Amino acid sequence: MKSTRPFHPTPVITIDGPTASGKGTVAALVAAHLGFHLLDSGALYRLAALASVRYGIAAEDIDALVKLIDDLHITFREGCAQLDGVDVSNDIRAEAVGNRASAIAVHGPVRTALVARQRAFRKTPGLVADGRDMGTVIFPDAVLKVFLTASAEARATRRHKQLMQKGFSANIDDLLRDLRERDARDSNRAAAPLKPAADAKLLDTSALSVDEAVDQVLQWYRALGQPA
């Protein structure tokens, strides 16, 4: 059946899913394989969250958050996330920052302030965008939409390993509880709740290696007649 999606000359692959489902790693490797640009939308939210904490802006102060986002100087360079010219890649991965990012994302105006920045990442030859609503809200015309899933236990284990490798202390039981609470909050929020697009490919990564997940995404992309 012929697609009814609006045509856009620059292809986008969206990879959505809950926290610690592996979407960031998979997206980065798919982008590297295809030579595409990469958008880590979660990093944008975390950068805004980190800045809000540093400037003393409450998670409920919507007007101040929107103004902050409009004024932020954000850049991504060689895998590093920079805020006001300073590499904060490790800072934004702290659990407290992740929880703040999820808390401010419930506000529609805050999300609107970041949408334009996310869409601006779409450049030739293509883009791989990872996040939570890339396929449903930001790039509804993406040529391939993938939604990664994994059990809460598997995701908590992955998150614990990531944090320990970065030098953060973490309790796996606390992480599991936080993940479940964040899943419930993100799935039930009024603005762009976490859910797969109707035409998304579902990929459970609980028992898959990173390479296996990447290979599956590339197979789906090739099946569309795209070079991969």
Curated annotation (Swiss-Prot):
EC nos: 2.7.4.25
Report keywords, A-Z. Answer: ATP-binding, Cytoplasm, Kinase, Nucleotide-binding, Transferase
Q: Which organism is it from?
A: Burkholderia cenocepacia (strain HI2424)
Catalytically driven reaction(s)? CMP + ATP = CDP + ADP; dCMP + ATP = dCDP + ADP
Q: Name the predominant localization.
A: cytoplasm
Q: Where on the tree of life does the source sit, at the highest rank?
A: Bacteria
What PANTHER family does the annotation carry?
A: CYTIDYLATE KINASE, CYTIDYLATE KINASE/PANTOATE-BETA-ALANINE LIGASE
The terms under GO molecular function for this entry are: ATP binding; CMP kinase activity; dCMP kinase activity
Annotated Gene Ontology cellular components are: cytosol
Q: Which GO terms describe its biological process?
A: nucleobase-containing small molecule interconversion; pyrimidine nucleotide metabolic process
Cite the SUPFAM superfamilies for this sequence.
Answer: P-loop containing nucleoside triphosphate hydrolases
- Residues annotated as binding ATP are 17-25
Q: Which family does it belong to?
A: Belongs to the cytidylate kinase family. Type 1 subfamily.
Q: What class of enzyme is it?
A: transferase
Query: Per its UniProt record, what Pfam families does this chain match?
Result: Cytidylate_kin
Name this polypeptide is given: Cytidylate kinase
Cellular compartments annotated: Cytoplasm
